[in-house]
A protein has these predicted regions:
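Hydrophobic core residues within well-ordered beta-strands of beta-rich domains
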Residues: 110, 133-135
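Outer-membrane beta-barrel translocator domains and adjoining extracellular loop/strand segments
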Residues: 125-130
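A structural "domain/chain start" motif
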Residues: 7-84, 186, 190-201
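Extracytoplasmic/periplasmic, Sec-exported soluble proteins
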Residues: 26, 46, 50-58, 91-94, ...
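Short, solvent-exposed, polar/charged sequence segments at loop or secondary-structure edges
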Residues: 73-122
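Short secondary-structure boundary motifs at beta->alpha junctions and helix caps
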Residues: 142-194
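A short, structured loop/turn motif at beta-sheet edges
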Residues: 23-27, 103-110, 141-151
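Sec-dependent bacterial lipoprotein signal peptides
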Residues: 1-5
Length: 201
């Protein structure tokens, strides 16, 4: 039984929670292809992206960000081959299956399981500030092969609109504001989460 006291941090729009020391678990991480949360917000009418595309993008961004921190991972194609016949249920249920399998057969010391809750691009070519891009995703690190929950983080960012102005001032503010895409926001989140993991080694 793990007895490490939970510890929370909040930085770069990331809320992170530690449940046990995670340093040794980062020796070789298996990254599970992200899930779309059951409450996924991705309506195309609202600037959203289909869940299968959103999860693919975030999985790739998080994987690349973790690799950039010098953390060894189980190659994505190797992981996919090992579990291609395992039906996916939910992130929480499958975490135990992946932790045991990746630990016993792929040499993983942990598995990172993620869910995308929102992946929405800005709407409106001239006034995107009314409907800005917004991304929310969360990850959980489990020890392998035992499946103990070690660490979790949630990234949540919606680009704020420029200050309220009127007339020509509003036009100038819109020109000065760089309207982020969902992809750019997700990239920032992936890098922030990878940075927190690297700091915990």
């Amino acid at each position: 039984m793990l007895s490490f006291a939970a510890c929370a941090t909040n930085t770069h729009h990331v809320d992170a929670q530690s449940y046990a020391p995670i340093g040794p678990a980062l020796a070789r991480v298996a990254i599970v292809p992200f899930y779309a949360h059951r409450l996924y917000e991705g309506s195309r009418r609202l600037g959203g992206v289909p869940p299968e595309l959103a999860t693919q993008r975030v999985t790739q961004q998080v994987t690349e960000a973790i690799l950039a921190e010098g953390i060894e991972i189980v190659p994505v194609d190797e992981f996919a081959r090992a579990f291609e016949d395992v039906p996916r249920a939910t992130a929480v249920i499958d975490a135990q299956i992946y932790a045991e399998g990746a630990g016993n057969h792929l040499g993983a010391t942990s598995v990172l399981v993620g869910e995308v809750l929102r992946y929405r691009d800005a709407r409106g070519a001239t006034t995107p500030g009314r409907h800005p891009a917004s991304v929310v995703f969360q990850v959980t690190l489990y020890e392998a092969p035992d499946g103990f929950k070690l660490w979790s983080a949630r990234y949540d960012y919606t680009q704020p609109p420029p200050p309220e102005k009127s007339g020509s001032d509003l036009h100038d503010a819109a020109l000065m504001q760089h309207w982020l895409t969902a992809h750019e926001i997700a990239q920032r989140g992936a890098e922030a989460i990878a940075d927190l993991l690297a700091d915990a080694r």
